[in-house]
């Protein structure tokens, strides 16, 4: 089997079989480029799901094993995405993450949403936060794969991304409340921002052999 990089569906094709022209049907690593991460622009990072956390990683593998079995394919590596945006005013980390404490202001939190169900979201343990964190950090960024990927050097697009963060929908994480065809999660947050900023989110590929559940949902909702 020949593994290819796709976002929300399968992660491999029979050897010698050509793709149907849809995004992800390629074995090129052209998306992985060396960039000057100190210059203004937008950089995308792909982090293995559960990097640095054995529980999340194990749960992710179980989820992917079940999904792959139902879809009749081999399991993929799952990825979580985050952005680093640099503008004249500074460097900002944009990411969706669990709420760890009540110091969200220090992490540039602009919104929160429920995890699993709206009822459970009454408790901090079952809420996520959207960060626009000046001089922030991406936990376990050292484990990022084929990253960073420079999406644009355009200052206007970079500022647009930053301005859009508070406008991102905050539906229940792990559910398809938006009717997008798949669950909403951290990847949906990032792809929504990229699509709404005017960049081509559909042309972005995950690392080879990987999958980013929720990515397509963000694009679908951004088009509405």
Where are these predicted regions, by residue range?
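Residue-identity detector for glycine
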Residues: 8, 16-24
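Non-catalytic ligand/cofactor/substrate-binding and regulatory segments of enzyme domains
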Residues: 24, 28-180, 222-224
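Active-site nucleophilic cysteine motif
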Residues: 78, 175-197
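Short helix-capping/linker segments at secondary-structure and domain boundaries
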Residues: 88-91, 195-203
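Surface-exposed patches in mature extracellular/periplasmic domains of secreted proteins
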Residues: 173-177, 201-206
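Short terminal or interdomain "cap/linker" segment that borders an active site or interface and mediates
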Residues: 207-224
């Amino acid at each position: 089997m020949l593994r290819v990089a796709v976002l929300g569906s399968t992660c491999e094709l029979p050897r010698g079989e050509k793709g149907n022209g849809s995004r992800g049907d390629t074995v090129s690593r052209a998306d992985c480029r060396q960039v000057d991460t100190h210059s203004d622009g937008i950089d995308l990072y792909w982090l293995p799901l559960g990097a640095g956390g054995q529980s999340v990683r194990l749960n992710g593998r179980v989820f992917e094993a079940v999904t792959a079995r139902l879809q009749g394919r081999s399991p993929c590596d799952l990825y979580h995405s985050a952005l680093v945006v640099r503008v004249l005013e500074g460097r900002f980390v944009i990411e969706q993450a669990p709420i760890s404490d009540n110091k969200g202001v220090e992490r540039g939190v602009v919104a929160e949403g429920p995890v699993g169900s709206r009822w459970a979201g009454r408790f901090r343990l079952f809420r996520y936060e959207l960060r626009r964190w000046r001089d922030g950090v991406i936990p376990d960024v050292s484990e990022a794969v084929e990253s960073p990927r420079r999406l644009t050097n355009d200052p206007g697009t970079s500022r647009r991304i930053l301005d859009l963060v508070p406008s991102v929908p905050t539906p229940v994480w792990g559910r398809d409340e938006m009717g997008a065809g798949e669950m909403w999660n951290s990847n949906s947050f990032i792809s929504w921002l990229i699509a709404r900023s005017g960049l081509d989110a559909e042309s972005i590929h995950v690392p080879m052999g990987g999958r980013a559940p929720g990515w397509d949902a963000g694009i679908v909702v951004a088009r509405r």
